[in-house]
């Protein structure tokens, strides 16, 4: 399979907020934020909580893992993860008549499918042919036998 390229993505840093009830020995793989890695007194921690609330974080979010919504073409956790998106033929075809007159003065807007280029700084897309055109080895063997 010489046509496949290995895609390399930057790992997104995961930041976990540690509650005061948990010890750091229980979860050694977690990345601590700079404010947590510094030794601080309880009074300073209260000031930090007030600052984080002012920045838009909810106070109850301090003890929970940050959750990001899934969009359908998510990257895996490992560096060897590949993203493959099959193109929809209907979206690739251009209209035969051309754009409508009122659309000439407006920016063309195309619906997003979740597999567009440019989703990240180093994203590369691997395009595959239409699955209907690709024959599997099982199909070839079945046709050669009478």
Curated annotation (Swiss-Prot):
The modification Phosphoserine is found at residues 63, 105, 144. Residues 16-146 are annotated as: Disordered. Isolated from prostate cancer cell lines; expression associated with progression to androgen insensitive phenotype. Expressed in normal testis and at lower level in normal placenta. It comes from the Eukaryota. Residues 79-92, 107-120 have a biased composition (Basic and acidic residues). Keywords: Phosphoprotein. Pfam families: GAGE. Residues 19-32 have a biased composition (Acidic residues). Belongs to the GAGE family. This gene belongs to a multigene family expressed in a large variety of tumors whereas in normal tissues, expression is restricted to germ cells. These genes organized in clustered repeats, have a high degree of predicted sequence identity, but differ by scattered single nucleotide substitution. Their sequences contain either the antigenic peptide YYWPRPRRY or YRPRPRRY which is recognized by cytotoxic T-cells. This is P antigen family member 1. It comes from Homo sapiens.
